[in-house]
């Protein structure tokens, strides 16, 4: 049955997705106490000014919620056209970067790869503070249009960023999809939640049309650094 849901997701995905298939890989890890500034400086020295074929990467710090790490890196870009422009870094450059990074990392966590199915077009880095929801979507043929409609018609508030997508290679628990909501800060995020709740008719329509969803949890994070562009 899950294979059927996956096939349905594929067919729907190409109808509502961005103009190209955008993918991401996220890697969680624990940074040694007090080492965040040094780690950020290392990323600056290696990635700042580098040209990407498409997309780029974020260095993020976990804030609230139960997650597997204190920080994470998110690489993103077009499928088949991501990563640095050829010749930007040598093999020796990468080896030194990874060796230097190990000095600041206490423990490595899990990694997942998936797709960014839809975005409202707001640059995530312009917001900086995000809440992410993870869920097992049992009826993607219902969820995708319902969630897209809510983003486009009902949830826009003070230029907030909204996007969602799938986990395709590796996943946290039984999660198949994720949804992200970005604001300027925690207080702005809470105001957005109140704004959504003040439109109970739209909220009721969303929950009644999105199909069966098993919500698995949520957490918040801050985007510390951006290299490349969304």
Placement of each model-derived feature along the sequence:
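Sec-dependent N-terminal signal peptides
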Residues: 3-17
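Short S/T/G/P-rich N-terminal loop/turn motif that feeds into the first structured element of a domain
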Residues: 19-203, 208-230
